[in-house]
C-alpha cells in the first residue's frame, strides 16, 4: 500500500498534476502500473481517511494542552522506532508540526499495513499529511526542504 501512496504522491501531487480523475480511472491506471486491486483499494481508503481528518471531528484533534507531552502506545512504539518518535518531537519543536498535524501523522502511520516504518518513509507520510492540511503550506515547504536538501561538504573530519 505504501508503494501506491508514494506513486500517487510523486506522479500527481508532487509533480503538480491535478488529481481530478475519478476513482475507477485511477484504479485502472494503478492496475496498469502493476499494483494489485486489494492494495489499490487500501491506499485509496487511506487517502480518503486522511481527507476526513481535515474535518476536525476526531476528539483527539479538538482539545489539547499546549504543554502536554505525547505518550505513545505500545502499538505506536512498535511501528515507530525511537529515531522516528524523536524526529516527530523535533518537528514539533521547530514548529513544522503542531499537536493536530502530529496526531494526523500518527493516525495515518498506524493505518499503514507495514509492521514498522523507517524514518525515510515516515518523512513521506508527514509530507503527505502536511500537503493535505489546509493552512500548513509553510510547514509543507519546510518539510520538503528537510527531505530534499542534502548536506553539503563533509560532516566529520
UniProtKB/Swiss-Prot annotation:
UniProt gene name: smg
Q: What is this protein called?
A: Protein Smg homolog
Domain of life per record: Bacteria
Similarity annotation: Belongs to the Smg family.
Q: Which HAMAP family match?
A: Smg
Give the species this sequence originates from. Shewanella baltica (strain OS155 / ATCC BAA-1091)
InterPro entries cross-referenced by the UniProt entry: Smg (IPR007456)
For this protein's source organism, the top of the classification is: Bacteria, Pseudomonadati, Pseudomonadota, Gammaproteobacteria, Alteromonadales
Amino acid at each position: 500500500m505504501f508503494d501506491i501512496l508514494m506513486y500517487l504522491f510523486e506522479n500527481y501531487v508532487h509533480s503538480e498534476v491535478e488529481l481530478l480523475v475519478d476513482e475507477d480511472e485511477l484504479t485502472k491506471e494503478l492496475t496498469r502500473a502493476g499494483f494489485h486491486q486489494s492494495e489499490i483499494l487500501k491506499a485509496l481508503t487511506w487517502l480518503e481517511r486522511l481527507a476526513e481528518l481535515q474535518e476536525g471531528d476526531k476528539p483527539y484533534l479538538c482539545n489539547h494542552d499546549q504543554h502536554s507531552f505525547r505518550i505513545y502506545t505500545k502499538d505506536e512504539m512498535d511501528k515507530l522506532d525511537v529515531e522516528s518518535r524523536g524526529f516527530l518531537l523535533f518537528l514539533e519543536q521547530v514548529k513544522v508540526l503542531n499537536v493536530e498535524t502530529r496526531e494526523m501523522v500518527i493516525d495515518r502511520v498506524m493505518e499503514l499495513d507495514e509492521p514498522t516504518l523507517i524514518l525515510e518513509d515516515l518523512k513521506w507520510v508527514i509530507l503527505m499529511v502536511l500537503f493535505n492540511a489546509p493552512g500548513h503550506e509553510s510547514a509543507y515547504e519546510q518539510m520538503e526542504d528537510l527531505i530534499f536538501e542534502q548536506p553539503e561538504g563533509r560532516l566529520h573530519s
